[in-house]
Amino acid sequence: MKWDEPPLWPVAVPSLAGFAAACIPYVFPNTPQLVGGELTTPFILLMIMSPLLYFSPEPTGGRAELILGANIGMFFAFLPQAIFFVWFIIVILLWLAQSMYVWRRNYPAFRIGTWIGLGAVSGLFIGGLFGHLILV
């Protein structure tokens, strides 16, 4: 998939969804925690919401590949955080770098999905910091 101009939805929608999911436990304090960790429940919510990519605009390519790529991108971006504390910085910088040039080249739907997954988890990390530092 190659766009003629920078697209807004693959950058804004996943990162805003991750940001909102990370802020939910802070806005609604009685939110049930499915498993331990502040961001694990919002991450599971993002995984549950990933099939909504099926309704993405047509030019993105294969819908199943897009969803699979987003899920793998989210796992790649989220799971190392348990071991490597500053992993979120790497994920956010990688997503920003990808956002600058991924739209200029012709990539398959799976690669676009990994970019979307990185954006969702970047929003999750930024929303977690925002919730912990501002909303508490």
Where would I find each of the regions flagged by the language model?
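Membrane-associated alpha-helix detector
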Residues: 1-80
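Lipid-exposed faces of alpha-helical membrane segments in multi-pass integral membrane proteins
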Residues: 13-20, 90-93, 123
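Membrane-helix interface motif
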Residues: 27-28, 88, 136
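Membrane-helix boundary connector in multi-pass membrane proteins
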Residues: 78-115
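The cytoplasmic-loop to transmembrane-helix boundary for the fourth helix
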Residues: 115-122
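Juxtamembrane boundary at the C-terminal end of a transmembrane helix
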Residues: 124-136
